Each structure stands twice: as structure tokens, then as C-alpha cells.
């Protein structure tokens, strides 16, 4: 198991229109509520590390030594019946990505990390309730939380 987390950020090889470098806003009084041990194992992340001060800095996006390239992603989509050519992560920072024990590359994203380049009125932080929905992941394989 790793007691630190080495991440790549393959998205930064894309043209700059697809992302903006973003640093998570400071989070006071960070603590662990629960840990998804199965996911931590898949990601090869030591649970003891996640509970440590270094792990808490990582989980809050504040470990600049290992996260020099955190970003927010841009995307397009329909909103209120109209195509909006530039939307983006208004309250999420992509810390990086890594190839897991099963050979699949997975993104590590901090949800509710504060305002980003793409933020609008209600964006920024996330309460424990909405984050819990991601944690339980409702059997959707595309989202799960450590």
C-alpha cells in the first residue's frame, strides 16, 4: 500500500480550452468521517495515510508537493433548453489520475473544493448531504468516493 499518492494529470496534455489550473480553497477543521476501504484498496492507498495529517492535506487538495497540476475541467452542454458552449466544474478540482490495481485509469476529484474559474452563483462548497450521495454512489460505477 502507498503511504503517499503519486498522481498524473493526463488532461493537461489537452489544449488549454479544456481545463483551467485550479487550487482548492482552504478548508478549516478537516477530519475523516468515513473511508471507503474497498476503493482505497483498489487505488492502492493506505488507510492509515488517509487518516494522517498528510492524508488529510491530500484529501482537502492542500498538498502542493504532490498536486502541482490540479485543474477544473471545461465542458459544453444544454442548459435550460439552450446549448451552452462553455460550462465547467464550478465546485470540483481534479487532483489527478492514476492507473489502479485493476489496470483501469481513474480520476481523483475533490468535490466541493470551493469556487473555480467555471463557478457561477451557487457554486463552490458542497454540504455533507450531497457528498454522501456520491459516497454511496447508488450503484453507478462512474462515481464513488474514498
Q: Where in this protein do the model-derived segments appear?
A:
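Nucleotide/phosphate-binding site architecture used for ATP/NTP-dependent chemistry
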Residues: 1-135
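Conserved small/polar residues in nucleotide/adenosyl-binding loops
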Residues: 136-142
Amino acid at each position: 500500500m502507498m503511504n503517499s499518492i503519486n498522481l498524473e494529470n493526463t488532461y493537461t496534455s489537452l489544449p488549454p480550452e479544456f481545463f483551467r489550473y485550479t487550487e482548492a480553497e482552504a478548508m478549516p477543521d478537516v477530519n475523516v468521517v468515513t473511508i471507503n476501504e474497498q476503493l482505497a484498496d483498489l487505488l492502492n492507498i493506505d488507510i492509515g495515510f488517509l487518516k494522517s495529517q498528510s492524508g488529510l492535506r491530500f484529501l482537502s487538495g492542500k498538498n502542493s508537493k504532490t498536486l502541482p497540476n490540479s485543474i477544473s475541467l471545461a465542458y459544453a452542454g444544454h442548459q435550460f433548453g439552450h446549448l451552452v458552449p462553455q460550462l465547467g466544474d464550478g465546485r470540483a478540482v481534479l487532483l489527478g489520475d492514476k492507473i489502479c490495481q485493476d489496470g483501469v485509469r481513474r480520476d481523483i476529484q475533490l468535490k466541493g473544493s470551493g469556487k473555480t474559474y467555471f463557478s457561477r452563483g451557487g457554486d463552490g462548497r458542497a454540504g455533507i448531504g450531497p457528498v454522501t450521495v456520491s459516497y454511496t454512489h447508488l450503484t453507478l460505477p462512474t462515481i464513488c468516493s474514498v
